[in-house]
């Protein structure tokens, strides 16, 4: 596909959640989606550390012999994300991000959080911890195994530490100085809350696709689907399985074709919270992920997601800097219609 191509795309007719944004023939009698022109640059451009797939198993191999480690997995114009492991008993001292919020997504183990203005709480597998800007917080690993989590911040965030505690180590190009200012933790406004757990608040509560985080350059929504609709006790069929598992008569996937949808500018990415998820990415290929893995669609990339685990729930936690519009392709409208 040529870069800088004026491509026709479909814009979802309503500014609904990531889980419900659809292109093409609208549901509930909405009629056809509106069509628009957008200037599309070449997709599948990944600048390190960004990559289509970060596999948890490979991260563990990279840090073999280490219990506590941190790996930068995403750094783009909107977000800065690290994958983290903490040994049992590891403590992280009080700190604050004065101008920006922070999200922790716990993959395994237990992490106990103390956040200003909130009751102390322990985050376990499936937890999404949402810390408002200007909130002093500390945390520690309380499980008897290593805890794993993804920390997500807006790009160019800064951290300060209360002067009552020890100063942090200086960067190679900086000096730690004492500053003075007053702070007030930002208030939670719906849908934001201190802690959300995908297993209890989405799967058990039949609220797949609910927006868990929507703040400045931070968005998170667990997309829940069942390949076998008989296992879905919520009674809404397969839910959000995207394009679903591959079928025997499917043609070979061509990453240089037009399929699925794009987003006009920002990247979209996903943390697999349970089940198996595949991602097809323009000019890049097809990737298969399991719980704890991270998939990333680079900006302006045609992409198509699918739930693959034949049994049980499949959840991909949709992440990004914004609540993105799904701009469906019009060249092959039957390929990836309604996937997220």
What positions do the PLM features span?
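Bacterial N-terminal signal peptides that target proteins for export
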Residues: 1-6
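Short acidic-glycine-tyrosine-enriched beta hairpin
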Residues: 117-134, 283-299
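Short, conserved beta-strand element in jelly-roll/cupin
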Residues: 85-86, 96-113, 243, 262-279
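A short hydrophobic beta-strand segment most commonly corresponding to one strand
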Residues: 130, 144-161, 296, 311-330
